[in-house]
């Protein structure tokens, strides 16, 4: 895969991973974390699992889980490798996060949230959440009333079968598909398994869309229910 760092590498400006770690592995208490985020215009990257992220996160943070296609999606969602970043990570994974970011050119990590989201909560600061439901609950709600469903999978996945009546907004081009997001109705987001849809939900939430519900297990789980889907071309 092509990462933005290729351009910078060609210019010979990429510091070593060890140099990056020395600068970036900096524990920041909540007050410092918040101050730096505002002063530096830093993007807060939360690398925890979606299942944990949904229950509480720093407002306007983006969730790209470390235990998934982490580097490719960081490259797709954060095109500027010079973007200042602040990290929220599971305790003990901070080194891995900074290392993996540095390897694909993201060397401007300003530190990580010391004590994680628990410390942020304990400091009395605001925490955001995203509702996540099982495919069975999604099916039950769909029986009660029409839903505004947004499928964030890639074009080929969508064409191979999708929820009838759903709208398509591929995650990698989500900023070009904001017109698909309903401003008033609740948006039910899903991908294939739940990783990409939480990335999408976090991005949309950061952009001010709070009427979001994400479907756990994605289309793989949805198609096992009685939710009407278009003909599946391949399994």
Residue locations for each model-derived region?
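Long hydrophobic segments that form regular secondary structure
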Residues: 35-36, 41
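Rhodanese-like catalytic fold shared by cysteine-dependent sulfurtransferases
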Residues: 1-22, 39, 50-235
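A contiguous, basic/glycine-rich beta-loop/short-helix subdomain that forms a polymer-engagement track
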Residues: 21-33
């Amino acid at each position: 895969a092509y990462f933005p760092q290729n351009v910078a590498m060609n210019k010979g400006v990429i510091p070593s991973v060890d140099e990056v770690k020395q600068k970036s592995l900096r524990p920041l208490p909540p007050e410092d974390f918040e101050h730096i985020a505002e002063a530096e215009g830093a993007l807060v990257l939360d690398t925890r699992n979606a299942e944990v992220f949904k229950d509480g996160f720093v407002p306007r943070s983006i969730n790209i889980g470390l235990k998934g296609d982490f580097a490719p999606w960081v490259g797709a969602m954060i095109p500027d490798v010079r973007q200042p970043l602040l990290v929220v990570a599971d305790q003990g994974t901070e080194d891995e996060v900074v290392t993996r970011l540095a390897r694909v050119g993201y060397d401007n990590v300003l530190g990580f949230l010391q004590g994680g989201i628990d410390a942020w909560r304990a400091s009395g600061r605001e925490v955001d959440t995203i509702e996540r439901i099982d495919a069975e609950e999604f099916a039950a709600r769909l029986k009660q009333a029409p839903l505004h469903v947004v499928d964030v999978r890639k074009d080929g996945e969508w064409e191979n079968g999708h929820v009838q009546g759903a709208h398509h907004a591929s995650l990698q081009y989500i900023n070009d598909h904001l017109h698909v997001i309903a401003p008033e109705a609740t948006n039910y987001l899903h991908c294939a398994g739940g990783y990409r849809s939480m990335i999408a939900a976090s991005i949309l939430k950061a952009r001010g869309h709070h009427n979001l519900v994400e479907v756990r297990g994605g289309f793989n789980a949805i198609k096992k229910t009685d939710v009407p889907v278009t003909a599946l071309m391949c399994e």
